[in-house]
Amino acid sequence: MADTSLMPIPGQVDPVPAPRDITPRADGRVDLMGLPKARIQELFAEAGLDAKQAKLRSKQVYHWLYHRGVTDFEAMTDIAKTMRPWLAERFIVGRPNVVEAQHSTDGTRKWLLQTDDGHDFEMVFIPDADRGTLCVSSQVGCTLNCRFCHTGTMRLVRNLTPGEIVGQVMLARDALGEWPKGRMDGLDDVEDTGHYSADGRLLTNIVMMGMGEPLYNFDNVRDALKLVMDGEGLALSKRRITLSTSGVVPMMERCGEEIGVNLAVSLHAVTKDIRDEIVPINKKYGIEELLQACADYPGASNARRITFEYVMLKDKNDTDEHARELVRLLKQYNLPAKVNLIPFNPWPGAAYECSTPERIRAFSNIVFEGGISAPVRTPRGRDIDAACGQLKTAAQKKSRAERDREAAAEAEAAASQA
């Protein structure tokens, strides 16, 4: 029987609880991905293990899942051989399904992923000289309708579960060979040459800046990030994780208290009229209310500054006056801030153009002169539509039937050569 647990589905600006059917696996097994150790222990007890065995086995399985990236119970060598088939009959360690993997000329990688119930979403890995950043999605689609963002042209399909969110991190580590036994079969689609941190990790940072508004899927995002930050699991420091919001003000304090990661705010305009147009949530939570929530954000300090994202749109939000007003607002609220200036990344049908390089530099200089760091973000992955604001699932760009025809043609060609 389908589980009809509540899932928050945001309307135009605020989440509204709404039921949705969760289709169980056809084989009846329970996916452990995205579950904390305590829940795994409960499931093992419900499946018939006594309390002592449930506690021991959950600790072992949790370690293999999140610390070593193992998906096959037979590979969990410190678990009794007789126990491994018992686990495999009842449980599974899932990953998002990979539909397509793309590699940009600048090293950026994008994966088109699919949930078990057939919904597509994307994640992006961006390598730099001293770090490797994974851009993670929180929803399939989005409701915020930001005018400059390709994802904003999609309807919201559903929230991603904790397993589907943390599964993106697991999948990226699979592909990058981040586990003790190296690359996972079938995922080493692109060779990487360098390591970006002292401990040899390629994936050093996570940004919740993929598809969707993370604070409209707060519980699932929180639960997933707790697994990522757990010292017995993926063990990524909260200082290396940034959550980006378009300004869901009522959830920002909880974000700081319950998750505690770095905060980024999609500001993009400094006047009500312009922000109402390009970031419609501003009609509900205005600039002043948003900036006050930033000033109150738990943990914000000069050592942990809030990042304000500002996409540069030609003749829309890029004048000297806009730059000076940005400085004034951030100083008015005494915010420990830095500003990321983002050249607009074009996509088919977009209503805007990117500001000229000269205009962007002039804007940046004014903000710098005002005492606030304002670097210009280098666009990454434009050639594979992986840059900021370009994510939109291939299901929207290319029909599934087209992809099926292409796959059938490839299979037929391979068979003819055999």
Swiss-Prot record:
Q: What's the family? A: Belongs to the radical SAM superfamily. RlmN family.
Q: Which residues participate directly in catalysis?
A: E122, C388
Tell me the PROSITE patterns matching this sequence.
RADICAL_SAM
Catalytic activity, EC: 2.1.1.192
Q: What else is known?
A: Reaction proceeds by a ping-pong mechanism involving intermediate methylation of a conserved cysteine residue.
Name the Gene Ontology biological process terms. Answer: rRNA base methylation; tRNA methylation
Q: Region Disordered: start and end of each range?
A: 1-21, 393-418
Stated role: Specifically methylates position 2 of adenine 2503 in 23S rRNA and position 2 of adenine 37 in tRNAs. m2A2503 modification seems to play a crucial role in the proofreading step occurring at the peptidyl transferase center and thus would serve to optimize ribosomal fidelity.
Q: Which SUPFAM superfamilies match?
A: Radical SAM enzymes
Q: Where does [4Fe-4S] cluster bind?
A: C142, C146, C149
**Record keyword Metal-binding present:** yes
Record's subcellular location: Cytoplasm
Q: What class of enzyme is it?
A: transferase
Keyword annotations for this protein, in alphabetical order, are: 4Fe-4S, Cytoplasm, Disulfide bond, Iron, Iron-sulfur, Metal-binding, Methyltransferase, rRNA processing, S-adenosyl-L-methionine, Transferase, tRNA processing
- Tell me where the signal peptide lies: none
What is the name listed in the Swiss-Prot or TrEMBL entry for this protein?
Answer: Dual-specificity RNA methyltransferase RlmN
**From which domain of life does this come?**
Bacteria
InterPro entries (UniProt xref) = Aldolase_TIM (IPR013785), Methyltransferase_A (IPR040072), RlmN_N (IPR048641), RNA_MTrfase_RlmN (IPR027492), rRNA_lsu_MTrfase_RlmN/Cfr (IPR004383), rSAM (IPR007197)
Give the catalytic activity: adenosine(2503) in 23S rRNA + 2 reduced [2Fe-2S]-[ferredoxin] + 2 S-adenosyl-L-methionine = 2-methyladenosine(2503) in 23S rRNA + 5'-deoxyadenosine + L-methionine + 2 oxidized [2Fe-2S]-[ferredoxin] + S-adenosyl-L-homocysteine; adenosine(37) in tRNA + 2 reduced [2Fe-2S]-[ferredoxin] + 2 S-adenosyl-L-methionine = 2-methyladenosine(37) in tRNA + 5'-deoxyadenosine + L-methionine + 2 oxidized [2Fe-2S]-[ferredoxin] + S-adenosyl-L-homocysteine
Residues engaged in binding S-adenosyl-L-methionine: G212, E213, S244, S266, L267, H268, N345
Q: Name one GO molecular function term.
A: tRNA (adenine(37)-C2)-methyltransferase activity
What positions belong to coiled-coil segments? none
What cystine linkages occur within this chain? C135-C388
